[in-house]
């Protein structure tokens, strides 16, 4: 009985500690893929009508374009105009380049006063923004205004980099038809998950699926076939090993 009482007391203590932690830091960090290193902190950074973006001069045109697209999507869904600032300040998103970091790595510091993104390359900035978007309300991925949402992100320090250089998805349109909008949606989902390669299986013996006006017979002839050719009878087994297999009967 004493052991049981001790066990119940321990369970009660654990539940109490978990409850206290939840009250101190109610933030949720639902990220895919989960970062390599993250320190969760209390508080939130709130986007308001005065929030601006400062892009360090060494970032270059590509990073400016990436931030412009983010600001456009944010304005469409949150109804807040994220203007580009000429210098850093409070309640800002600050983007900097650090060439000592690995190619696709990023560092994200979110405090109550600002969001700092540091990366070595434009791709690192992209992945940092994808993390920010995952921390925002899901409405950020929509097409309509959702001004009533809580447009804020939980405070945290995140250091992240991909484990694999090739992170891809295979899309077979030779056997399965997809519209252009469906392909774009797949690319958007890939971006959310920080994938970097689309293996687009455009053609196969089933047909040619890409119309090229200069070569019309590719689709006139190559887009259809009467049958699938198979070899029904195999002969001349020589039982000789080849490529790890015998050229005899293989089941």
List the model feature ranges, each with a label:
Residues 4-8, 92, 99, 227, ...:
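Short linear motifs in intrinsically disordered/low-complexity regions
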Residues 12-17, 35, 71, 222:
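Generic low-complexity, intrinsically disordered sequence content enriched
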Residues 20-167:
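Acidic, contiguous N-terminal accessory segments
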């Amino acid at each position: 009985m004493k052991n049981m009482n001790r066990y119940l007391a321990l369970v009660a203590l654990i539940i109490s500690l978990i409850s206290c932690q939840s009250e101190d830091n109610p933030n949720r960090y639902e990220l895919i893929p989960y970062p390599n290193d993250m320190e969760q902190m209390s508080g939130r950074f709130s986007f308001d009508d005065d929030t601006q973006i400062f892009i360090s001069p060494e970032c270059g045109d590509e990073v400016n374009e990436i931030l412009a697209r983010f600001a456009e999507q944010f304005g469409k869904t949150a109804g807040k105009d994220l203007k580009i600032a000429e210098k850093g300040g409070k309640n800002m998103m600050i983007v900097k380049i650090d060439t000592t970091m690995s190619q696709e790595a990023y560092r994200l510091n979110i405090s109550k006063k600002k969001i700092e993104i540091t990366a070595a390359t434009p791709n690192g900035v992209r992945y940092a923004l994808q993390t920010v978007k995952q921390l925002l309300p899901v409405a950020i991925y929509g097409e309509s205004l959702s001004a009533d949402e809580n447009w804020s992100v939980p405070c945290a320090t995140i250091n992240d980099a991909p484990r694999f250089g090739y992170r891809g998805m295979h899309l077979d349109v030779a056997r399965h038809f997809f519209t252009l909008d469906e392909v774009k949606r797949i690319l958007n989902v890939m971006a959310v998950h920080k994938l970097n390669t689309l293996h687009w299986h455009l053609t196969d013996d089933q047909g040619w699926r890409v119309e090229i006006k200069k070569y019309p017979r590719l689709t006139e002839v190559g887009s259809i076939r009467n049958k699938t050719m198979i070899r029904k009878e195999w002969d001349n087994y020589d039982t000789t090993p080849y490529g790890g297999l015998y050229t005899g009967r293989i089941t």
